Amino acid sequence: MGLSEKVEFKTLDGLVLRGFLYSARAKGPAIVMTPGFNFPVSLLYHEVALGFQAAGITALVYDPRSVGRSDGLPRSDINPAKQSEDFSDAITFLKTKPVVDPKRIALWGYSLSAAAALMAAGLDPRVKLVVAVCPAPVPYNFEAPGKRRKYLDLAIRDRESQARGKEPFYVQYIGDSEETALFDYRKQRGMEELEYDEVVENLTKIAPGFRNEVTIQTLRRLGSWSFADVPQRVGPTPVLQVFAVHEELEHIRKTQEAIWAGLTGPKERHTEDRGHMDVLTPDGHRFAHLVKVQVDFVLKNFAQRMR
């Protein structure tokens, strides 16, 4: 953390987003990074940012709106379309930094934020490339039997309740049953034998500010988010898409293959022998190689742009 500084910037709609800037030693390319679904900046993302910084790439990593240190109410109210817009405001902020070449700015995302990064790349011509780690436009199984109707009914009840001045409805994020939570942690690779309290405690340790809940309106937005044509809109922007061999949820695996097939511009595919939840775990040589793959992709493509 000694190689970074705390920063903040405003979104167009007036929220303050907070994070860390890892400035390179000399002027050069930069990359904007945000965590996955309902997750604040953690040690995992700092390790990746340090890898970019060491290679001469300035990295900005920040908490998404309503998560962690960033502003936004209600808390843990996830809005992928707004997260995509926030990427653009982060680019505007980075362009003010003397160490950043404004013509060489990339986006990096994981899970939901990877999908938001791809959407931003299709709408913001300042995005010159994207690193998409295990993109998941809808990171939970909204189509599971009974879930869509259950959550949509709750969302309407919540809107009526909030109209009467009540607090927003929340749903548990990670739990030990899909009946009561979005994710059953026991189905995630490496977590099968853990106790629920241990899982939440570990997440809170690595990501201070983690909240194990999201608003019901989050689910309504994700259920209505149209992502099918986003890969085609990315157009000529180069994309590195990282896959996990042991991606736990079938609907995410299918979506990732559809994203890959839909990308019409320059693209590279890299596969990790991990699951969705542990693909970014700093575990020695494997993780170091994954960071190198990303760094090499960014440097190679930006070098080509300089010719």
From Swiss-Prot:
Keyword Hydrolase part of the UniProt annotation = yes
What terms describe the molecular function in GO for this protein? hydrolase activity
What Gene3D superfamilies does the record point to?
1.10.10.800, alpha/beta hydrolase
**One Pfam family, short name please?**
Abhydrolase_6
EC annotation?
Answer: 3.1.-.-
Which InterPro entries is this protein grouped with? Answer: AB_hydrolase_1, AB_hydrolase_fold, Polyketide_trans_af380
Q: What's the protein called, per UniProt?
A: Thiohydrolase apmlB
Say which species the protein is native to. Arthrinium phaeospermum
User: Which gene name does the record give?
Assistant: apmlB
